[in-house]
Amino acid sequence: MYRVVYYTDKRGDSPVEDFIRSLQLKARAKVLKWLELLEEYGPDLPRPYSDSLRDKIRELRISHSKLEVRVLYFFWKDKIIVLTNGYFKKERRTD
C-alpha cells in the first residue's frame, strides 16, 4: 500500500490541500475516494483515474457533474505519493 502526503512549503502552506478543501462536498468526497484508490494501486492505477503527464508527473483525473478536477502528484522514495497542486481543467487538449 502507498501513502499519500500533501506537499507543504516552508511556511507550512499546502496549496493542494487548500484546493481540495475548497471543493464542494460531493466533489471533495469523490477526490478523497480517488485518493484512496491511488493509495491502494499506486502506479498501477489506470485511466480514467490517473494518467502520466511528463517528467514523472502524473495527474489524478476526477470528473464530477460538469467539473473536471485534476490533482498533480509524483512518486517519492519508497511508496510515498506527493500531491503538489490541484486545478479545474477548462478545455480539451487539441494537439
Language-model-detected regions and their locations in the chain:
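Basic, Lys/Arg-enriched alpha-helical interface segments
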Residues: 1-68, 77-81, 88-95
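Conserved Hanks-type protein kinase catalytic core
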Residues: 74
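Portal/gating segments that form or line small-molecule/metal binding sites
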Residues: 71
